[in-house]
Regions:
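The conserved cystathionine-beta-synthase
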Residues: 31-49, 56, 97-114, 121-122, ...
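A glycine-centered beta-loop-beta connector
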Residues: 24, 45-48, 53-69, 110, ...
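Tandem CBS (Bateman) regulatory domains
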Residues: 11-28, 67-96, 102-111, 126-127, ...
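N-terminal cationic amphipathic segment used for targeting or macromolecule association
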Residues: 5, 15, 40, 50-51, ...
Length: 155
C-alpha cells in the first residue's frame, strides 16, 4: 500500500511541509531472532538506545516486531525474562509502512493501531524503522529534515 505522495500538512506557522517516511526513518535496524530471550533483547535495545527490534523469522513468515512495551508487559506479568523467548511475545500482525508514505500517514497508522513503531518495507524488504520519536523529531518548528540518532546501530 502506497501513501499519497502529495499529502501536505500545515506546520510552522502555516508554512506547508511534506515529508516522507524515508526522510525520518532510521535505516539502522536492530534485528533479532525469535529464539532470543527477552533479557537478551532488552540488553541489545538498551545498548543501542532503541525501543524496538525487528524479528526475522527463519521460516520466512515475514518480519515481526518486539518492543520495550512487550518486554515490560511480560515481566510485569511475572514471566522470567531469562526463560521467555521473543517468539512468545512478538507482534506478528504488523502494519508496515512504505518509505513513500507521508509522515502524516505513518502517524495516523500508529494512532489507529495503538503502537509507536512501524517497520518500513520496500518491495518486501525491511529498509528501516520509524518511531513516534522520529516523527516528532521531524516535525520541528523549523521543519528541518532530522538527522538520525547517533547511537542507532545494526544488530
Amino acid at each position: 500500500m502506497r501513501g499519497d505522495e502529495g499529502a501536505r500538512s500545515h506546520l510552522s506557522g502555516g508554512r506547508e511541509a511534506s515529508m516522507q517516511v524515508r526522510e525520518g526513518m532510521s535505516e539502522m535496524v536492530l534485528t533479532v531472532g525469535p529464539g532470543h530471550t527477552l533479557r537478551a533483547v532488552a540488553g541489545l535495545m538498551s545498548e543501542r538506545a532503541v525501543g524496538a527490534a525487528v524479528v526475522m523469522d527463519p521460516e520466512g513468515h515475514g518480519p515481526g516486531i518486539i518492543t520495550e512495551r512487550d518486554i515490560l508487559i511480560a515481566i510485569g506479568a511475572g514471566q522470567d525474562p531469562d526463560a521467555e523467548s521473543v517468539a512468545e511475545h512478538l507482534t506478528r500482525d504488523v502494519v508496515y509502512a512504505s518509505p513513500d508514505w507521508s509522515l502524516e500517514e505513518a502517524a495516523a497508522a500508529m494512532v489507529r493501531g495503538g503502537f509507536r513503531h512501524l517497520i518500513v518495507l520496500d518491495h518486501g524488504e525491511t529498509v528501516g524503522i520509524l518511531s513516534v520519536r522520529d516523527v516528532v523529531r521531524c516535525w520541528t518548528e523549523d521543519g528541518a529534515i532530522c538527522p538520525l540518532p547517533s547511537r542507532a546501530a545494526v544488530g
